Amino acid sequence: MIDLQLTPVSWQIMMVAACAAAACGLLGVQLVLRRRAMLGDAIAHGVLPGLVIGFVVSGSRDLFPMLVGALIAAIFVSILAEWLREHAGVDGGAALGVVFTSLFALGIILIEIFARDVDLDAGCVLYGMVEYAPIHQVEWFGYSVPRSLTPVLGALLLNLGATVLFWKEWKLCAFDPQLARASRLPFQTLEQGLLVLVAITSVACFEAVGSVLVIAMIAVPATIGHVLCDRMSSMVIVSTLAGVVSAVLGTVGAIQLETGVPGMMAVSSGGLLVGAVLLAPGRGLIPAATRNFSWTMRVEMEDILAESHLQSMDSPPDHTDSAGAPSSRFFRILATW
């Protein structure tokens, strides 16, 4: 029997995961509309050298210096990939692939050189440690909360504020970049600012959920919103809610199945995407097939009625023969479906 009663520790894990998913989902909409969702992948893998350099410079594994190093590396990844795309004539996907693979390999080499005897595991960057978030606590207004909630919630509030503040500008840049340039908007500044926010969000979520889940939470909830919605405002709301629902389902599922929360969150978001693709009222496969079948049956029924009418006008009424041909045709139509 499934026990859905969650402990306070489980609620804290869910809270951290939900804030991380919502923060990623807000920016994921902007990246999906620009067809650059894999930028989060590049940043998530490319920050490893920054983490190592932050450790080497500070001499400790304190959160702040390593986050600063990772943030600098993430901004460098986004700017370098954008520069290659704009000025070197390199395809956007190829530029991201070159940048993040090179920097991730560099990070592995730096770990082997400078941190071989230190418990600095690249796997923690990939998979996070959201299950251990309640271990490290800080005080908020007299309440004890997970330490990793501070950067994650900060990233969520920052992304929410930026989305509200630059709503019209980002919307124009996403749907009509040529008009945005012609309107004398600071197009490059707005796009670079978006990349910086992606970098900040990725770094803020690393300790909690790892780079793999950052990639999933940037791309999948926004894609769900894109499938279900025709307006950008609705897409942002649906994307954020899809991320939060994925966090809830992932946490509960991981507890019940005794597996990792980040992986279960990614699986949950993938399941929601499959459900959206199948059942979306406007674009879903099942509603589309139902509409096609309904229209086909309507056309065929009208043809049967027309044929019956013509037969009744051209020959004396013979109920057996006149109804036989249309009826047999109708059953043949059903047999094809």
Predicted segments with their positions:
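Short amphipathic alpha-helical interface segments
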Residues: 291-331
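Membrane-interfacial amphipathic/re-entrant helices at transmembrane-helix boundaries
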Residues: 1-22
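Membrane-interface capping segments at transmembrane-helix boundaries
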Residues: 168-169, 279-290
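Hydrophobic alpha-helical transmembrane segments
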Residues: 14-19, 64-72, 94-98, 149-154, ...
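Short loop segments and helix-boundary regions at transmembrane helix junctions
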Residues: 29-120, 225-237, 252-264
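Helix-loop-helix "hairpin" substructures at the membrane interface of multi-pass membrane proteins
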Residues: 144-216
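Hydrophobic alpha-helical segments embedded in the membrane of multi-pass proteins
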Residues: 22, 45-46, 101-102, 189-200, ...
